[in-house]
């Protein structure tokens, strides 16, 4: 089996959402990133896009409080010109240690669950784990 390798050639912020009507309305494959607060989800997206500051990061848990959509462009490693293949990288709020009220955490949990249950375009969920902490 031959596997195609891809290079990410750019990323742009598209939208922040807390309900389905705020999601991008085009049909594009989505890859979601989920994990504990401050595990590095936003930092990973910045690294993949090779753009410091694309996704906002903080040393304080709970910086990401909405579902954030980023449009990424990719090309096959064997091709010189970027293919117009686009996917959304979806940065989800972290769970566990955000310094916020329980009601706010419950709201985050509700809109994350609705997104994951109802997105037609969600193709992959990447769970990030920090090996310094036991899974929740």
Regions found by a protein language model. Give the residues of each.
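Acidic pyrophosphate-coordinating catalytic loop
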Residues: 74, 132-135
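Inter-motif core of Ras-like GTPase G domains
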Residues: 103-132
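Conserved G1/Walker A P-loop phosphate-binding module
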Residues: 1-99
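Conserved ATPase-coupling elements of RecA-like P-loop NTPase cores
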Residues: 97-104, 134-136
């Amino acid at each position: 089996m031959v596997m195609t390798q891809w290079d990410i050639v750019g990323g742009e912020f598209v939208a922040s959402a807390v309900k389905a009507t705020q999601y991008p309305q085009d049909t594009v494959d989505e890859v979601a990133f989920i994990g504990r607060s401050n595990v590095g989800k936003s930092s990973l997206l910045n690294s993949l896009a090779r753009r410091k500051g694309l996704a906002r990061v903080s040393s304080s848990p709970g910086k990401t409080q909405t579902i954030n959509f980023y449009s990424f462009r990719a090309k096959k490693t064997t091709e010189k010109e970027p293919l117009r293949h686009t996917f959304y990288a979806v940065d989800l709020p972290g769970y566990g240690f955000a310094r916020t009220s329980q009601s706010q955490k419950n709201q985050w949990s509700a809109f994350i669950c609705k997104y994951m249950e109802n997105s037609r375009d969600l193709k992959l969920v990447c769970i990030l784990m920090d090996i310094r902490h036991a899974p929740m």
